Amino acid sequence: LPAYHMQEFPWLDNLAAAGVQPEEVDYVLCTHLHSDHVGWHTRLQDGRHVPTFPNARYVISKTEYDNAAASEGADDNNGAFLNRIMPVVDAGLSDLVDGEHGIGDSLVITPAPGHTPGHVAITLNSGEDNGLFIGDAMHSAIQGVFPDWNSGFCQDPDTARATRRRLLEHCCEYNALLLPQHFGKPFATRVRPQGDAFAFDFMP
């Protein structure tokens, strides 16, 4: 969708305000490769797209990469594969991974298909606490009340439903902080079972 592509938000300025420069980033973890999730993978320099984080490893599901490559000509992803992914691959900065993949002692990437074939979730462990980044496995908090509801963008609706329930049940079992990308503020929530659905306790 054009509304999610080539936007001029002060993202790098916000990163700098947090004390991080692009050259200091070690990893870029990709839940999936839709254009609204890969916009800062590259930036324009002298009329061409170059990696925004020149010293980082961009970790991408191989299944997701293959799916995006096969549909590169589709109009619904705004040329993101050509402009946002291939410059990273051509620079030798991509790590294509299969199945569960760990990074150090704190990060674990696990398959979470449905929204796209190679969509993943990312667990961040910090001592006794942990959080779960779920990408586009959910788009709205209403999906806690109605976990079988999909967005119109889920490529495999049945798998998306099963994945969503699995991720929510994981958060309940391990008291993991749910970290969705599309809810808006306050962004993070604990999850409780509520009958056949789920309730959220959003963080202040």
Stretch-by-stretch model annotation:
Residues 2-13, 127-204:
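Cap/insert and terminal regions of metallo-dependent hydrolase folds
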Residues 3-20, 24-36, 52-111, 159-166, ...:
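Metallo-beta-lactamase
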Residues 33, 63-64, 114-116, 135-137, ...:
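Active-site metal-binding loops of divalent metal-dependent hydrolases
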Residues 38-48, 190-191:
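Metal-dependent catalytic neighborhoods of phosphoester/phosphodiester hydrolases
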Residues 101, 113-114, 125-126:
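Short polar/acidic secondary-structure junctions
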Residues 119-124:
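Short beta-strand scaffold segments in enzyme catalytic cores
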